[in-house]
UniProtKB/Swiss-Prot annotation:
This is Phytase A. Its main location: secreted. 1D-myo-inositol hexakisphosphate binds at Q49, Y50, R80, H81, R84, T87, R164, K300, H360, D361. The active site is at H81 (nucleophile). It holds the Pfam family His_Phos_2. Gene3D superfamilies: Phosphoglycerate mutase-like (3.40.50.1240). One of its GO terms (molecular function) is acid phosphatase activity. It is found in: Secreted.
């Protein structure tokens, strides 16, 4: 586990970012099962996909509660893995950058003092202990939300084949089972859930939880180009300030972003509960964090979402699997589904009522856009920051943070013959598109499926190999 060689007082760190003192999270409950990570929210909710999960239920006028006259009959969670160390390639770049700063800077004063003796010791790729705890909490929350179903059944669980994703599924199970065993009304004698299916991430293998098949998409630079464009907009003034404050250093725009990345990665590695904020965070202003957060949204939107012509197509396979589960009918798909797995009841049952799938932020972004959840989001500006109000709720921090979870629930109500479907992303009800959503954001199941014509037709998947 990574160890930070210098820890600054929490109140100093946040006051450097926001200008106001902050109560130590050790004195308050700021990381909970229900609300997720609310510690240092003035900055931690601005880390894009590197933010730990936080509930955004209050960002919708629609209640996330199940109406009293309705009963949930089906629930599916699609989850991102928990907080992790940087990827191996990024970890090497971060270490190299910090070493260069330490070698070249002739002065380390004020908020930069910690850099002089900072020891880079972050791991790579795997979950941090904090990330493991996130998924335990996620399992507890899933059980509690769908208790009437969960107390009597065992969920069917799949994971994409990277170690951190599999481990996330296992930690989710730990939390789910902990909640179930603590429920006096739960059915006794049932086996504990297991990760029933692990889908390999070997290149060329069909996997609805991890993209890799679409040649044209994998070769696309649309996301990188958009990211570079906005990076060039907001980083020059930061480069100028940092080079002045750290005399002797020469930094690129990309390296500024790397230093900002360290704020999140260092924080989630310091403690199991996220109660210490990394001193890297104080190196940047509140406005700069808003710009950084928007950069991550631009990157995801143009890399894997609606801003990439083939982005939503990468989510078609999972969306067709979801339709099969909702309708209890065989999967109909010719994109990323694995026919061998999906035609076998042992590896793709259609009679379950609880499902959990574990994936990555990129593929989840594609799934959300394949389902049309953010069809009302206009193309993101690549030159100026847009608020989440302007993007109709879309941002990478609010959709695919570490430990993100989307719930697809089907309910039977006394005033409706047909079951109703709705989707919540990190607790925010997303009014369904392509069908006549009611005041709860729900659509009749058949109308929901009919509205997914992009998915059921295979969309523009054929362009992958043109």
């Amino acid at each position: 586990m990574a160890v930070l060689s210098v820890l600054l007082p929490i109140t100093f760190l946040l006051s450097s970012v926001t200008g106001t003192p902050v109560t130590s999270p050790r004195q308050q409950s700021c990381n909970t099962v229900d609300e997720g990570y609310q510690c240092f929210s003035g900055v931690s909710h601005l880390w894009g996909q590197y933010s730990p999960y936080f509930s955004v239920d209050d960002e919708s006028s629609l209640s996330e509660d199940v109406p009293d006259h309705c009963q949930v009959t089906f629930a599916q969670v699609l989850s991102r893995h928990g907080a992790r160390y940087p990827t191996k390639s990024k970890s090497e770049k971060y270490a190299k950058l910090i070493k260069a700063v330490q070698h070249n800077a002739t002065s380390f004063s004020g908020k930069y003092a910690f850099l002089k003796s900072y020891n880079y010791s972050l791991g790579a790729d795997d979950l941090t202990p904090f990330g493991e705890n996130q998924l335990v909490d996620s399992g507890i929350k899933f059980y509690q939300r769908y208790e009437e179903l969960a107390k009597n059944v065992v969920p069917f669980i799949r994971a994409s084949g990277s170690d951190r994703v599999i481990a996330s599924g296992e930690k989710f199970i730990e939390g789910f089972q902990k909640a179930k065993l603590g429920d006096s009304k739960s059915k006794r004698g049932q086996p504990a859930p297991i990760v029933n299916v692990v889908i390999t991430e070997t290149e060329g293998f069909n996997n609805t939880l991890d993209h890799s098949l679409c040649t044209a998409f994998e070769n696309s630079t649309t996301g990188d180009d958009a990211e570079d464009k906005f990076t060039a907009v907001f980083t020059p003034s930061i480069v100028e300030r940092l080079e002045k404050d750290l005399p002797g250093t020469t930094l690129s725009s990309k390296e500024v972003v790397y230093l900002m990345d360290m704020c999140s990665f260092d924080t989630i590695a310091l403690t199991r509960d996220g109660s210490r904020l990394s001193p890297f965070c104080a190196l940047f202003t509140q406005e700069e964090w808003a710009q950084y957060d928007y950069l991550q949204s631009v990157s995801k939107y143009y890399g894997y979402g609606g801003g990439n012509p083939l982005g939503p197509a990468q989510g078609i396979g999972f969306a067709n699997e979801l339709i099969a589960r909702l309708t209890k009918s065989p999967v109909k798909d010719h994109t990323t589904t694995n026919t061998t797995l999906d035609s076998n009841p042992a590896t793709f049952p259609l009679n379950a009522t609880l499902y959990a799938d574990f994936s990555h932020d990129n593929t989840m972004t594609s799934v959300f856009f394949a389902l049309g959840l953010y069809n009302t989001t206009e193309p993101l500006s690549q030159t100026s920051v847009q608020s989440t109000e302007e993007t109709n709720g879309y941002s990478s921090a609010r959709t695919v943070p570490f430990g993100a979870r989307a719930y697809v629930e089907m309910m039977q109500c006394t005033d409706e013959k047909e079951p109703l479907v709705r989707v919540l992303v990190n607790d925010r009800v997303i009014p369904l598109q392509g069908c006549d959503a009611d005041e709860y954001g729900r659509c009749k199941r058949d109308d929901f499926v009919e509205g997914l014509s992009f998915v059921t037709s295979g969309g523009n998947w054929g362009e992958c190999f043109a």
